A protein has these predicted regions:
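Bacterial N-terminal signal peptides
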Residues: 5-16
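His/Glu-rich zincin catalytic helix
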Residues: 43
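Peptidyl-prolyl cis-trans isomerase
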Residues: 24, 28-31, 39, 60-216
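Signal peptide processing junction and immediate N-terminal pro/mature segment
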Residues: 16-23
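Short, surface-exposed, low-complexity cationic segments
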Residues: 46-60
């Protein structure tokens, strides 16, 4: 579940100038969903859409993003109840650096960031929240994921070797790739368990989606 790593920015509404006429004021935000006694705003969807556009060069539909935000709400509430610690500044900086180095060049990173409209503060908040949620899910589900040697070998033969051949490269040895394969399979297992947990959690919650009304 890749969705679950991304922050929810509750952007404040900026009041209009008191000296201005009522006709000049306009609604700048709407409620996209109610989850229990909380709300998710249309601006939250827009913020996550901009972040996806920045990281991936494209974004999901509003409905898909809303589902991700509901998932994030559940994880955030559970992490809060568990008093799960927030990431340290050094961890946030490391994650930000990983985002930067995922681009071919600094120029492309800056250009994409400018295109998305994200400020440095918004970027940091997004990355911090993503790290917090993903770390909580890791701590909750990792111990329950067991990977046997046969599964690692199968993944090596069916995924690693063919991918290397398709790129005209020599595949690493199984032993050289073992740790990386195991971690990838553990992450897949965490995602699978988290997905099942989220489905069960949503079934117990009062969730009212108002996205169609919010976009009118």
């Amino acid at each position: 579940m890749r969705g679950v790593a991304i922050c929810v920015l509750l952007l404040s509404l900026i009041p209009g100038n008191a000296a201005g006429s009522a006709a000049r004021q306009e609604t700048v935000d709407r409620i996209a969903a109610r989850v229990e006694n909380d709300i998710i705003l249309l601006s939250d969807i827009r913020a996550l859409s901009r972040y996806q556009q920045f990281v991936d060069g494209k974004s999901e539909s509003d409905a898909q993003i809303l589902d991700r935000l509901i998932d994030q709400w559940i994880v955030r509430i559970e992490a809060g109840v568990a008093r799960f610690p927030r990431p340290f500044d050094a961890e946030i900086e490391h994650s930000l650096e990983r985002v930067r180095t995922s681009f071919p060049s600094t120029e492309e990173y800056e250009a994409r960031k400018k295109q998305s409209g994200l400020s440095d503060a918004e970027m940091r908040e997004m990355v911090s929240a993503q790290l917090y949620l993903s770390d909580y899910l890791d701590s909750r589900f990792r111990a329950g994921v067991q990977i046997d040697p046969k599964t690692i070998e199968d993944f090596y033969q069916k995924s690693v070797v063919p991918m290397a051949k398709s790129r005209g490269q020599e595949a690493p040895t199984l032993e050289a790739a073992r740790d990386s394969i195991q971690e990838a399979l553990v992450q897949r297992g965490i995602n699978d368990q988290a997905d099942r947990w989220l489905i069960e959690s949503k079934a117990r919650l009062h969730i009212e989606k108002l996205l169609d009304e919010a976009t009118k």
